[in-house]
């Protein structure tokens, strides 16, 4: 495993203080990491752990790291040590081997040290092309530990659409990387795979996690050398990526020229012309959304019927058993098309309406594609063929109406079927249903009768309850 050392920090930039406002922090973290890995001065014990039929090489536990921080940095409170460990992990210097969320836990969770090549002090600014190569490479290796997470699969589909014209080049680069990796020792390959994954967890974090590579705009303005060098992680050389994957130590820091100033002025003028919403409009939209959903928030509006887990009212169970949607539920379907698609009962009602108009194939196709994304990999190809034959093939029994562009793209995708083969077709059908079928459903007697029936039922129940109270 590639371990950190003082000499290995030489892969950084020429003058740290001139290159990144965060370099002082990186240097301090790297000093801690170097000492943590130094066996001679009492570093953290790095060991290989046996796990059932396999071995997990070069790992440390979260407890060992926390205890080392408390002992060597004179930290008395374990919470403070865990917080410091989480900050170091968030920068990618330490990472959990089985989780995409970079945080520190004071337990037996296994962690691994990042290779110095991937340290943030190297001022990485990886391109989307590199990310596409990485994700594509992961899909080529049939290993459980390398399976894409849901958000990674979505990112891959988005990148595949964005780089459609040069996807063949990306695929070839990924294949070349896989061939190189296969020549490496099994243990070394396992370690490098995890380090590479941790690198991308820092630069393309899990949705909901903070991106620690983003820099404060005020710090950026204070830089004497604002030219950020873009580097390819895999050494890809293109017009947009001609830089070496590592900065050269001897590279001098050049002075700002007139051309640099002109480029900066052009960039700032472009920023001025960008379309930005006024804060008043944003606040107005947020208030409208809050007012619309306030009655569905149990923290603000008491739920009706009340929660049976915290009260003696069991009416909720009766409603669920009856399979009849409440008035609130029916009303919510009218908020947006996504609301009715999220609700199982709403989808069933919408499907019945479409069947009555002999146009249910659009919704059935959309649901089939959603189900395809959740299928096991071994069943995907078969399911893709079934969907094609049912909805898109010439003479299909439930043919859907696609524009020529979407149909052509889908026809090409079917030749090499995957979970996202019908992405363009699904998006087209979604927009079609949202603009046409959904609007007609809200105006239909089926929806209006359902909504009025719930209101009428509620008013009759209220009158019945009032009568019982008066008689008693």
Curated annotation (Swiss-Prot):
Looking up PROSITE patterns in the UniProt record yields:
DEP, RGS
Could you list this entry's UniProt keywords, alphabetically sorted: Cell membrane, Cytoplasm, GTPase activation, Membrane, Nucleus, Signal transduction inhibitor
* One BP term from GO: G protein-coupled receptor signaling pathway
The protein's matches in Pfam families, at most eight in alphabetical order, are given as:
DEP, G-gamma, RGS, RGS_DHEX
Identify the residues that the record assigns to the RGS domain, covering every copy: 336-441
In UniProt terms, what is the effect of altering residue 309 to F? Diminishes interaction with GNB5
Annotated Gene Ontology cellular components are: cytoplasm; cytosol; membrane; neuron projection; nucleus; plasma membrane
May I ask which residue range the UniProt record assigns to the signal sequence?
none
Where does this polypeptide localize? Answer: Cytoplasm; Cytoplasm, Cytosol; Membrane; Nucleus
Q: Which GO terms describe its molecular function?
A: GTPase activator activity; GTPase activity
Membrane topology, as annotated:
Peripheral membrane protein
**Domain spans labelled G protein gamma:** 261-330
InterPro entries listed in its UniProt record: DEP_dom, G-protein_gamma-like_dom, GGL_sf, RGS, RGS6/7/9/11, RGS6/7/9/11_DHEX_sf, RGS6_RGS, RGS_DHEX
| Main location group | cytoplasm
**The DEP domain covers which part of the protein?**
40-115
- SS bonds (residue pairs): none
**Can you quote the domain comment?**
The RGS domain interacts avidly with Galpha and mediates the acceleration of Galpha-mediated GTP hydrolysis.
Self-association state and partner proteins as the record states: Interacts with GNB5. Interacts with RGS7BP, leading to regulate the subcellular location of the heterodimer formed with GNB5. Interacts with GNAI1.
Q: Tell me the function of this protein.
A: Regulates G protein-coupled receptor signaling cascades. Inhibits signal transduction by increasing the GTPase activity of G protein alpha subunits, thereby driving them into their inactive GDP-bound form. The RGS6/GNB5 dimer enhances GNAO1 GTPase activity.
From the Swiss-Prot or TrEMBL record, give the protein name: Regulator of G-protein signaling 6
Please report the organism this UniProt entry assigns to the protein.
Answer: Homo sapiens
């Amino acid at each position: 495993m590639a371990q950190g050392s003082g000499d290995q920090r030489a892969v950084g930039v020429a003058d740290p203080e001139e290159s990144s406002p965060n370099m002082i922090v990186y240097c301090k973290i790297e000093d801690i990491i170097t000492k943590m890995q130094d066996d001679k001065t009492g570093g953290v014990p790095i060991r290989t752990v046996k796990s059932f039929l396999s071995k997990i090489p070069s790992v440390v536990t979260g407890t060992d790291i926390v205890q080392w921080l408390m002992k060597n940095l004179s930290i008395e409170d374990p919470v403070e040590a865990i917080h410091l460990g989480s900050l170091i992990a968030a920068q990618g210097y330490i990472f959990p081997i089985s989780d995409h969320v970079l945080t520190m836990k004071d337990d037996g969770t296994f962690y691994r040290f990042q290779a110095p090549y991937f340290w943030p002090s190297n001022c990485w600014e990886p391109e989307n092309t590199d990310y596409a190569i990485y994700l594509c490479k992961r899909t080529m290796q049939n290993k459980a530990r390398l399976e894409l997470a849901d958000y990674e699969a979505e990112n891959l589909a988005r990148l595949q659409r964005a780089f459609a014209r040069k996807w063949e080049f990306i695929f070839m680069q990924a294949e070349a990387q896989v061939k190189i990796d296969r020549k490496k020792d099994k243990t070394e390959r396992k370690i490098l795979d995890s380090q590479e994954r941790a690198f991308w967890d820092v630069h393309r974090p899990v949705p909901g996690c903070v991106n620690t590579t983003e820099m404060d705009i005020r710090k950026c303005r204070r830089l004497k050398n604002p030219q950020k060098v873009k580097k390819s992680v895999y050494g890809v050389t293109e017009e947009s990526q001609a830089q070496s994957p590592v900065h050269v130590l001897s590279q001098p820091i050049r002075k700002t020229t007139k051309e640099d100033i002109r480029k900066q002025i052009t960039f700032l003028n472009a920023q001025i012309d960008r379309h930005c919403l006024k804060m008043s409009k944003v606040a107005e939209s947020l208030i409208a959304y809050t007012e619309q959903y306030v009655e569905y928030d149990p923290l603000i509006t008491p739920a009706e019927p009340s929660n049976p887990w915290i009260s003696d009212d069991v009416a909720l169970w009766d409603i669920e058993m009856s399979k009849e949607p409440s008035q609130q539920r029916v009303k919510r379907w009218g908020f947006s098309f996504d609301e009715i698609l999220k609700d199982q009962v709403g989808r069933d009602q919408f499907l019945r309406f479409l069947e009555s108009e002999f146009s249910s194939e659009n919704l059935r196709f959309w649901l089939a594609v959603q189900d395809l994304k959740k299928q096991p990999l071994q069943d995907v190809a078969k399911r893709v063929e079934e969907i094609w034959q049912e909805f898109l093939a010439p003479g299909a029994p439930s043919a859907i109406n696609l524009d020529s562009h979407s149909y052509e793209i889908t026809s090409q995708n079917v030749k090499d079927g995957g979970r996202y083969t019908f992405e363009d077709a699904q998006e087209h059908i979604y927009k079609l249903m949202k603009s046409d079928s959904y609007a007609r459903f809200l105006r239909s007697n089926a929806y209006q009768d359902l909504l009025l029936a719930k209101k009428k039922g509620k008013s009759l129940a209220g009158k019945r309850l009032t009568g019982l109270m008066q008689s008693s």
